[in-house]
């Protein structure tokens, strides 16, 4: 009697899953208005986490550290102290 020893191999490759391939959505942080630009009161000037830039004249700070203009005027990014920055809004005479 003739015995056949057959071995079958997979015709389709098994596909494993990966634990990579996802990332959080970007938060669009940073400057929203340029130095010297005219803004209206309530305009967002800078979005940040923590106080990378401090509020100066006529600028408020929101609960998430966003800096916004309190009055209509021109934006001015300034340095104060040795290594700190602030943003101010100065009224423009018309």
Curated annotation (Swiss-Prot):
tRNA-binding keyword on record: no
Removed propeptide positions: 1-9
SUPFAM superfamilies xrefs: Ribosomal L27 protein-like
Pfam families named in the record: Ribosomal_L27
Protein family: Belongs to the bacterial ribosomal protein bL27 family.
Lineage of the species this protein comes from: Bacteria, Bacillati, Bacillota, Bacilli, Bacillales
Species this chain originates from: Bacillus velezensis (strain DSM 23117 / BGSC 10A6 / LMG 26770 / FZB42) (Bacillus amyloliquefaciens subsp. plantarum)
Keywords: Ribonucleoprotein, Ribosomal protein
InterPro entries cross-referenced by the UniProt entry: Ribosomal_bL27 (IPR001684), Ribosomal_bL27_CS (IPR018261)
GO biological process: translation
Single Gene Ontology MF annotation: structural constituent of ribosome
Protein name: Large ribosomal subunit protein bL27
PTM description: The N-terminus is cleaved by ribosomal processing cysteine protease Prp.
GO cellular component, as recorded: cytosolic large ribosomal subunit
NCBIfam families, A to Z: L27
């Amino acid at each position: 009697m003739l015995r056949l020893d057959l071995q079958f191999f997979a015709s389709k490759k098994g596909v494993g899953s990966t634990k990579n391939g996802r990332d959080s959505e970007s938060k669009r942080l940073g400057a929203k208005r340029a130095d010297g630009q005219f803004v209206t009161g309530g305009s967002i000037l800078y979005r940040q986490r923590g106080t990378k830039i401090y509020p100066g004249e006529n600028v408020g700070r929101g609960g998430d550290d966003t800096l916004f203009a309190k009055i209509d005027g021109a934006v001015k990014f300034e340095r104060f102290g040795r290594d700190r920055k602030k943003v101010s809004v100065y009224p423009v005479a018309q």
